[in-house]
Amino acid sequence: MLNKQLLSKIAQFTLLSAASSASCSISAGEADVVRVVIKKTSDGQFRIDTTVRHEDTGWDHYANRWDVVAPDGSVIGSRILHHPHENEQPFTRSLTLAIPANIKEVTVRAHDSVHELGGAEILVAVPH
């Protein structure tokens, strides 16, 4: 039988999934991307503001990177996270990079030092 906490997380995820395709609110052992905003800059690049949630416990287990991934699975860019964010959850960091005009959507995924990949990802349109 599922406990109340798990049922609550399932209900929370279901409600959020129905309301928005650009956010997620599940926090687990893996690092979850919970929000992504992409804006075109004046020089034609894209600033990607990404919010990550992870239960960082210190240097032994923390969210250490997030990636911007093309539809073919290739990594367009990565934002390295140089330290744990134990007291700042969720946290937002930015990356500015060029995205080819033929790429209309990207997936943003987070990585942690123990589980690597596997948390919630977000697919977002590129505003060319």
Walk through the language-model features, giving the residues of each:
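Ser/Thr-rich low-complexity repeats and stalk/linker segments
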Residues: 70-78
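Short, surface-exposed binding/anchoring microloops in extracellular/periplasmic proteins
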Residues: 29-63
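Hydrophobic residues positioned within well-ordered beta-strands of beta-sheet architectures
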Residues: 34, 48, 64, 93-95, ...
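Edge beta-strands of extracellular beta-sandwich domains
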Residues: 117-126
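Beta-strand signatures of extracellular beta-sandwich domains
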Residues: 65-69
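Short, solvent-exposed, Trp/other aromatic-anchored flexible loops in extracytoplasmic proteins
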Residues: 78-116
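N-terminal signal peptide c-region/cleavage motif recognized by signal peptidases
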Residues: 20-25
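Bacterial N-terminal signal peptides that target proteins for export
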Residues: 2-14
